[in-house]
Amino acid sequence: MRVDLFDFELPQELIALRPAVPRDSARLLVAAGAGAIDDRIVRDLPQLLMPGDVLVFNDTRVIPAQLTGKRGEATVGVTLHKRLDLRRWQAFVRNAKRLAPGDTVDFGNDVSADVEDRADDGSFTFAFRGDEPVEVLLDRAGTMPLPPYIAGKRATDERDRDDYQTMFAREDGAVAAPTAALHFTSELIAALDERGVARQTLTLHVGAGTFLPVKADDTDDHRMHSEWGRIEHDTADRLNAAKSRGGRIIAVGTTSLRLLESATGEDGVIRTFAGDTDIFITPGYRFRAVDGLMTNFHLPKSTLMMLVSALMGRERMMDIYAHAIAQRYRFYSYGDSSLLIPEGNTK
């Protein structure tokens, strides 16, 4: 499909630079099947789901993956985006013209890394020096890697270390937050428990590639980035059991959805998973695992706009986004959210 079919105009003032306070006071656009669009707030979620439904969260934890370093007199900006092993990371680099394998970049605070190679996509492999865990080094020298549409408008600060982390964050490794889950609070979870809505977690370490623009003119020509994920055996069993009882699987965030679909066979059975996924979901895809999605609002012509269009239909999504813009919903990572239930999965 043509990539420009997923384009829309977004007023810049609708890009959220800070999250709602409290988190569950954010607005929630609800689109169930072909019915009317409903304007709610995230705190209403228990009323919108049924007992036996399952919310699936991503428990990845965002690391301070944004680094500024020196190679000689030159300053370079480094954004880690994928762990290769305990000490080696792939990274995107700004001001990298003279950076070459064999160079050492000093990030200050006794943190440095050697450049091992440069990939065809322009990214670099860095090997961090020393014996301390890389996570300890990053806590000392790194900052939170805010998306470019926020970082281009304001500086990262200490608030972001909390704001850009979900309450479910357990497993270090993401360089972008699974932002739909940012809206949850302990009070909301308690209300969902009382309603009989279950929850499960998986891990997908979101990479900076999630923000890369689609440069191809046609979706068939786009090369999707890969990310590492894991679904435990017990989690898969509980999800399959819920499905067999008629419960709906509602992915909280596109990262949860992509991993669930990667782990599910044509028979609709969710299986254990541990490895990379580069699944690219576009209109025409047949969903095998999920019955609905809670997700924030996405960038024009992005792979995630294509994903939600696959779930709901492209024209339906364009109508939903037109409504969101007209009603002044706040967009992107720190913005409002939506609950999308495709035709046939409403109750």
Swiss-Prot record:
Chief location of this protein within or outside the cell: cytoplasm
Reaction(s) catalysed (UniProt annotation): 7-aminomethyl-7-carbaguanosine(34) in tRNA + S-adenosyl-L-methionine = epoxyqueuosine(34) in tRNA + adenine + L-methionine + 2 H(+)
Pfam families associated with the record: Queuosine_synth
SUPFAM superfamilies: QueA-like
Pathway: tRNA modification; tRNA-queuosine biosynthesis
GO cellular component terms, A-Z: cytoplasm
GO MF term list: S-adenosylmethionine:tRNA ribosyltransferase-isomerase activity
Keyword Transferase: yes
Protein origin, superkingdom: Bacteria
EC numbers for this chain: 2.4.99.17
UniProt keyword annotations, A-Z: Cytoplasm, Queuosine biosynthesis, S-adenosyl-L-methionine, Transferase
Listed GO biological process terms: queuosine biosynthetic process; tRNA wobble guanine modification
UniProt-annotated location(s): Cytoplasm
Oligomer status and interactors: Monomer.
Annotated function: Transfers and isomerizes the ribose moiety from AdoMet to the 7-aminomethyl group of 7-deazaguanine (preQ1-tRNA) to give epoxyqueuosine (oQ-tRNA).
Family according to the record: Belongs to the QueA family.
Protein name: S-adenosylmethionine:tRNA ribosyltransferase-isomerase
Organism of origin: Erythrobacter litoralis (strain HTCC2594)
